[in-house]
């Protein structure tokens, strides 16, 4: 066997593994809309889907625009939550959109999987409640009078349908190849933790009915939390994520804390297998790790957004730039606010 043939074979194997990453479907966010999908053939052309996701697409064509919105929601929330960290969820014009970061068993990958699974559940549920989908609507299982005395009415979010679709679509790659590998178990656990960030924070919203604003009758319905709340919950779980390893208990393979002194993780916690890189330098061999050169930093902060940590000890540039702010705002009857535009010079700091 020639060395050239061996190198070519290894390269093809690497590309196959890389392209089969379970989060590749996030590439749907790069599409302006998939609402124009009107037949099953179009599903074959959607980049980033594995074959079993293509089959789900063909059976659920009308749901795919909600999935696309979910993908964009996941990317936007990731970039918001990590805006002040060395890795800030920068995306690529390729699959996977976050690069090789999500192919490693790090806590960053754990966050991406959790927020992605949550985003599909959220977007599909919202599509159900808004009447976009023929296959689902409001949750009619919530009815009657509650123990607190109010009447269940209105449109309760059908979170059960959204979660079920997320489980079938997002989890399909891990389940199709079996659940015996440590990475498959990690991904499935974090997917479920992401969905629980919605389920465990469902809220009750109510409306009063009566004469002159009285509350003689109160009707209530169950609603999902804002997705920013979901992102905040998952980010907190990221900060406290548990490093785990695969262990066989009887005939079952399970993930357990690598440090036996740590308490076992719950279904709501994030877990990871490998330590994260420092993300300081751009690594052309690792797509998705952009480094922190040129990133803005906070000169006075001692946290991760501070120049000392963000710039990894390389120092930073400082320049004065002019910014325009609204100022001297006044309320005018009725009913608008009028502001002046004020210019001022501020110092901006960027990493070397």
From Swiss-Prot:
Lipid addition sites, O-palmitoleoyl serine: 212
Keywords attached to this entry: Developmental protein, Disulfide bond, Extracellular matrix, Glycoprotein, Lipoprotein, Secreted, Signal, Wnt signaling pathway
Family classification: Belongs to the Wnt family.
Tissue-wise expression: Caudal forebrain and neural keel, the floor plate, the gill slit and the developing pronephros.
Family annotation (Gene3D superfamilies): 3.30.2460.20
Stretch forming the signal peptide: 1-22
Organism: Danio rerio (Zebrafish)
Coiled coil regions in record: none
Alphabetized GO MF terms: cytokine activity; frizzled binding
Protein name: Protein Wnt-4a
InterPro entries recorded: Wnt (IPR005817), Wnt4 (IPR009142), Wnt_C (IPR043158), Wnt_CS (IPR018161)
PANTHER family per UniProt: PROTEIN WNT-4A (PTHR12027:SF105), WNT RELATED (PTHR12027)
